[in-house]
Amino acid sequence: MIEANALMKAAKERTGLSDWGDDWYLEPMHWLVDAINTESELTEFGAGAVPEMLIAHLVNQLEVNDWFKRHPEIGEVEITAPLFGIGLPRTGSTAFSHMMGLDPATRILRVWEQERHCPPPEKATELTDARIAISQAGEEGFQQLVPEATEMLPRGVDKSQECAHVLMEAFSSGPSFELFVHVPSFNARTIAPEYESNMVRAYEYHKRVLQLLQWRCPPNRWFLKTPVHTYDIEALLKVYPDANFVWTHREPLRSLSSVCSLIYHFRRAFVDNPNPVYLGHEHRAYWTTALKRTLNVRERIGEHRFHDVYHRVQIVDPAKQVREVYAHFGWHYPAEMDGWIAGWQEEHPKGKHDARPEFFGLDPAGVEEEFRFYTERFGL
């Protein structure tokens, strides 16, 4: 059994810190621990790895709060018009974010600085930071544990990481935790309408992390991405009212089958009950709601705040889509960018990933009908 108080004690001992700041997130942390204990059947590896993951989130919370206390000027750092990648999962958004991050003028959330935010990175040492080697060792271990991951996702510790991991440090975004553990009760609580005020607070923490990372390590033009922003876009906009969005698109059945397969392979390392049919049912309902929410927001705040990127085009000519994003938002497109993208493609050939919808209880005809509002809107 995982004990929440023991996790908090371990985080305090590792950091020498004890001030949790605005500690609202400790309540959902207790919810999560209860759900893991009652709903997840942890593997031997998971029994060790899951508590360590939770302690790491608490460590980041303690350290971020401490840096803001000692350097209140961090709170004055401006995060201006961040560009967020949204949309269904498994739409090519990870590859797209890696390519967007090739531009030195664009700031991304790199894997190594996401895993441990503090001390805040500095421009002079960002390429030699000791955390890079630590993160690389962890990545190599993970690839041995889940070898399928290398086929499913382009990876690299100096490449962009999904910023859902920052929301996880606020013990929000239940679907993100479900990548590792089976916690349906926690997931239901964090996606319920009454949780939105807490999601706003989670995004406020998200912004504090960006301020910390940008403070001594520009550039200041952020590109961030995670599909869960699609569900929580209202909360996001309350914290980032000038945000713009790149919306990646793919046929829903392919997207749902692929994300369920990805989660299933990840989960098997951590739990003995990966529940494939539950994954299909849960993600079908979740993403239907998420897409409808974002469509409503798009109608309200305007088409000019969004640009659409299509998986079918990206696999043929990704540079074309990146150029179009730059043009839409008025960014300068470097002359070298096409070459950088071509080089990235050579280093990251597309992997093979077979996902069978029926294994996850996904009925093709039913999915087609349920997502018709979306596929007809975007010509999928």
Where are these regions (language model features)?
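PAPS-dependent sulfation machinery
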Residues: E115-W222
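PAPS-dependent sulfotransferases, especially Golgi type II membrane carbohydrate sulfotransferases
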Residues: M1-D66, P184-Y203, L210-C217, C260-L380
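Short His-Asn-centered micro-motif
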Residues: I86-L88, F223-P227, H311
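Glycine-rich phosphate-binding P-loop
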Residues: G85-D103
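Pre-Walker A adenine-sensing motif
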Residues: D66-E76
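Post-Walker A helix-loop "phosphate-sensing" segment adjacent to the P-loop in P-loop NTPases
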Residues: L102-W112
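Pre-Walker A (Motif I) flank of P-loop NTPase domains
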Residues: T80-L83
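Conserved phosphate-donor/acceptor-positioning beta-strand/loop module used by diverse small-molecule
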Residues: K225, L236-S261
